[in-house]
Amino acid sequence: MSKRVVIFDTTLRDGEQSPGVSLNLHEKLEIAQQLARLGVDVIEAGFPIASPGDFEAVKAVAEQVRGPVICALARANRKDIERAAEALRGAEEARIHTFIATSPIHMQHKLRMEPDKVLDTAVDAVKLAKSFTSNVEFSAEDAFRSDVGFLCRIFSAAIEAGATTINIPDTVGYATPQEFGAFIKAIINGTPNIDKAIVSVHCHNDLGLAVANTLAALENGALQVEGTINGIGERAGNASLEEVIMALYTRKPFYNLETSINKSEIYRTSRLVSNLTGMLVQPNKAIVGKNAFAHESGIHQDGVLKERTTYEIMNPEMIGIFTNNIVLGKHSGRHAFRERLKELGYSLDDEKLTKAFARFKALADRKREITDEDLVVLVEDELRAFPEAYSLEYLHITSGTVLVPTATVRLRREEENFEEASCGDGPVDAAYKAIEKITGTGARLASYAISATTAGEDSQGEVSVKLEREGRFYTGRGVDTDIIVASAKAYLNAVNKIVFDGLPKAKTERAV
């Protein structure tokens, strides 16, 4: 009989530590709800002591998301643990994840503590966490560079104090698979009461080995995997959960392990995380990359057409990438639209369906054939609609080789229209300067990226931007068949998030 692997998602905590990523409460909740649909076992929602915003995010996820265990991170001290417990009060099932560093370099230079003091601190932390919840995880930070004998001692003491999960991180991504597998086995063999806890691993990707190390750990007795969607995280990121999950599924005869993941939600979850964080998925990324199921070689194409398994070890439909020969157009009705969305896995209420159908009709007037990719982009845009302080009413651009690029923009806020014109270094820059004149955010454009979401000369373009305002980053996304319009929508989407955060007030002297 196969053993079940616990999937612990830390996209909202470790993943959000990616440089330039800053999710607001609304976005964190959206990701958490999708992770619940994906079927992860544990959601690490944040680090409550880190900031009031982190506390509120963990609290909201704990109160509103049902299904997975909701986890909060805490250092091994009273203040952190009590704050985590407070944030988790509304959870259906809560877990406190407390940690302390155990490697000689960390104990000496960061903690300035002797090993015995570190052990005592860990035990006290676990006991305190246990007074708030029966579900307690203890992590030894920088475990792979720690002494195995000391790890066995501290893990044994933590389990005795009440820890139900023991986590073994490769914090700096230094391990190799053969080493890490042997390391896990040595800890399991050297910790007498290890059978009273689940052994977990948390691998970083500094050498590109996070997934390989995770799988090696599972081969050697670990039964919880910690990672993130798309492998995002600080530095080179974390183990990519979708890769671990599909490796276990595809190679089940080898690993004899299974998960409770709803695999058909993998692709949708990946897209959501990518869009909200602004971190684009590389085209050749395993499982969810744009080219993951693409075949350009004639020999490969011929083989796949004759028998898919000649060059594909999994079906794209398995992870939620659906293909269909039925093409919708401007003459397609509401019923056909709804039915196709259902086939793609989307169930919209009447209000959202009405809005999405109106957008579909508008797109069909500009685009001869509407593909599944178009529908996915359209419906996800509607499902993720962010509260709009400003909406784009009008955009006019003049540009060319002998013209000064100029943009005229009209935005609507509540019942008032605001219009401005500006010149710039190209049409996009001109549009952004005009929007900035109206909104007055004072934000800096930190990044700008374009990708084609669908194929063909009338394809939709997707623009992703990041605005930086007082050290915080705001991601915006816009989609349109006109890339300049998509660019304006993306910038405005990020501006609305700044306004949603309460800064700054809009200028009103230009009402028209």
From Swiss-Prot:
Enzyme class per UniProt: transferase
GO molecular-function terms, A-Z: 2-isopropylmalate synthase activity; acetyl-CoA C-acetyltransferase activity; manganese ion binding
Pfam families with a match to the protein in the record: HCS_D2 (PF22617), HMGL-like (PF00682), LeuA_dimer (PF08502)
Cross-referenced PROSITE patterns: AIPM_HOMOCIT_SYNTH_1, AIPM_HOMOCIT_SYNTH_2, PYR_CT
Name of the protein in its database record: 2-isopropylmalate synthase
Gene3D superfamilies: 1.10.238.260, 3.30.160.270, Aldolase class I
Catalytic activity of the protein: 3-methyl-2-oxobutanoate + acetyl-CoA + H2O = (2S)-2-isopropylmalate + CoA + H(+)
Gene assigned in the entry: leuA
UniProt organism field: Heliobacterium modesticaldum (strain ATCC 51547 / Ice1)
Cofactor(s) needed: Mn(2+)
Record's keyword terms, sorted: Amino-acid biosynthesis, Branched-chain amino acid biosynthesis, Cytoplasm, Leucine biosynthesis, Manganese, Metal-binding, Transferase
Enzyme Commission code: 2.3.3.13
Main location: cytoplasm
Family: Belongs to the alpha-IPM synthase/homocitrate synthase family. LeuA type 1 subfamily.
Its biological purpose: Catalyzes the condensation of the acetyl group of acetyl-CoA with 3-methyl-2-oxobutanoate (2-ketoisovalerate) to form 3-carboxy-3-hydroxy-4-methylpentanoate (2-isopropylmalate).
Annotated region (Regulatory domain), positions in chain: 391-512
Location of this chain's protein in the cell: Cytoplasm
SMART domains named in the record: LeuA_dimer
Gene Ontology CC: one annotated term: cytoplasm
UniProt subunit comment: Homodimer.
GO biological process: L-leucine biosynthetic process
Pathway: Amino-acid biosynthesis; L-leucine biosynthesis; L-leucine from 3-methyl-2-oxobutanoate: step 1/4
Domain Pyruvate carboxyltransferase: 5-267
